[in-house]
């Protein structure tokens, strides 16, 4: 709990500094500009610092709050309209109000069959989890969730028990190496434990070797390479944040994957995989070049 408060204090403090830095730069410039009036390099440096600061402010306060919808069609053999949300990271960076906005948008999607929440639901949360995640209770469609590494102490606090209870109280079905059958859609859904937390039970998948219409939810897309003698029709994942700070030619080196996943659709030897770039942030509190996303996946 102490770590929770330290992380939140650090984020609030650095965010405050970002906001006041332009004022400090302006005051500094006003104070010393007469000494450097005839030096173009000085003006270039000042302009550069202002631009960098405003870019950081945009990446901290503006782009993370832009929520877009992305539509994708995938051939799977079963027909469904799935809303995929991932990595909301409610806690240090994203608030309950942010989650309310997400749920409002999800509820406005026509003809959705169900919602998948692909893990990393929290990020150093403070307070009662049931209250923090209460917007989930307003979902108009069934919702199925798995945990991510930040929900399973890899890294982060170990809050699995509390999180499971909070999700269930808010009408979200929690799956950890568990399955359910959606009879109306004829789809078998398996939700796996987190890969980084070493909680993936591949034996659970062995039960579905000869089953058609198999949908797997796994937080990290790398999980598919732990599948043994099975090839699901579709695996839904998150975890990558699409790089989060999407600087061309650089961001891919910082994506937490061993197999080159970024965001979007992949056809692999282990089956079809769709990776959401998600809604939240970890590490640096910035999101740039990759707005928060709600994925709408129509399978056929």
Language model regions located:
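Beta-strand-turn-beta hairpins that frame and shape the catalytic cleft
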Residues: 73-83, 172, 179-190, 209-212, ...
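Conserved beta-sheet core of the metallophosphoesterase superfamily
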Residues: 221-298
């Amino acid at each position: 709990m102490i770590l929770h408060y330290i992380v939140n204090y650090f984020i609030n403090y650095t965010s405050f500094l970002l906001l006041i830095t332009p004022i400090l730069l302006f005051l500094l410039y006003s104070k010393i500009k007469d000494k450097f009036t005839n030096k173009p390099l000085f003006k270039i440096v000042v302009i550069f610092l202002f631009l960098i600061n405003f870019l950081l402010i945009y990446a901290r306060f503006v782009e993370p709050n832009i929520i877009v919808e992305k539509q994708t069609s995938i051939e799977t053999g079963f027909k469904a309209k799935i809303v995929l949300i991932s990595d909301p990271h409610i806690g240090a960076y994203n608030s309950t109000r942010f989650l309310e906005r997400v749920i409002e948008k999800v509820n406005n999607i026509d003809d959705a069959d169900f919602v998948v929440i692909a893990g990393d639901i929290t990020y150093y949360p403070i307070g009662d989890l049931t209250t923090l995640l209460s917007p989930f209770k307003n979902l108009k469609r069934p919702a199925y969730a798995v945990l991510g590494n930040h929900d399973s102490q890899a890294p982060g606090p170990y809050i699995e028990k509390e999180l499971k209870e909070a999700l269930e109280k808010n009408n979200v079905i929690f799956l950890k190496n568990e399955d359910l059958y959606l009879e109306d859609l004829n789809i078998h859904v398996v939700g796996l434990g987190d890969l980084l937390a070493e909680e993936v039970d591949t034996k659970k998948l062995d039960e579905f070797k000869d089953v058609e219409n198999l949908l797997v939810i796994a937080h990290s897309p790398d999980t598919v390479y732990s599948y043994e003698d099975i090839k699901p029709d579709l695996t839904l994942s998150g975890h990558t944040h699409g790089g989060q700070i999407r600087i061309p030619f650089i961001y891919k080196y910082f994506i937490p994957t061993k197999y080159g996943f970024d965001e979007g659709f992949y056809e692999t030897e282990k089956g079809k995989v769709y990776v959401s770039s998600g809604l939240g942030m970890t590490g640096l509190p910035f999101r740039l070049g990759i707005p928060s996303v709600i994925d709408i996946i129509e399978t056929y």
